[in-house]
Amino acid sequence: MVNTNKLRGIIAERGLDQKDVAEMIEKSPKTFYEKMKKGKFDSDEIMKMVSGLNIENPAEIFFATDVN
C-alpha cells in the first residue's frame, strides 16, 4: 500500500501539485486522484513518479506497511 501522506509531502516539496504528477504518469487528474484515494499504483506509474519526483527511498512510500 502507498503511503499517500508521504507522497503528498514530496509532491509539495517539489513545488508541484497532483495535477502535475497526473501528467507525469500520463493519467488524467481524476484517475490520479482515485489512485491516491485507493493508495494503489502500477509499477510503471511508480517508476515514473520515482524518476520524475527524484524520490530517494521509494520503498518507504510505495511499499509501506504502516501508512499512519
Residue ranges and their predicted role:
Residues A12, E23, S51:
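Alpha-helical residues within the helix-turn-helix
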Residues K6, D17, D42-E45, N57:
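Residues that mark the N-terminal boundary/hinge immediately upstream of a DNA-recognition element
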Residues R8, Y33-E34, F62:
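Key DNA-contacting residues within the recognition helix of helix-turn-helix
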Residues N54-N68:
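Short C-terminal boundary/hinge segments that cap the last helix of small helical domains
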Residues G15-T31:
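Short alpha-helical DNA-recognition segment
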Residues M1-D20:
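A short, Lys/Arg-rich alpha-helix, primarily the initiator
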Residues K38-S51:
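Short, basic-rich loop-to-helix N-cap that marks the start of a DNA-contacting helix
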Residues I11, M36-K37:
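DNA major-groove recognition helix of helix-turn-helix
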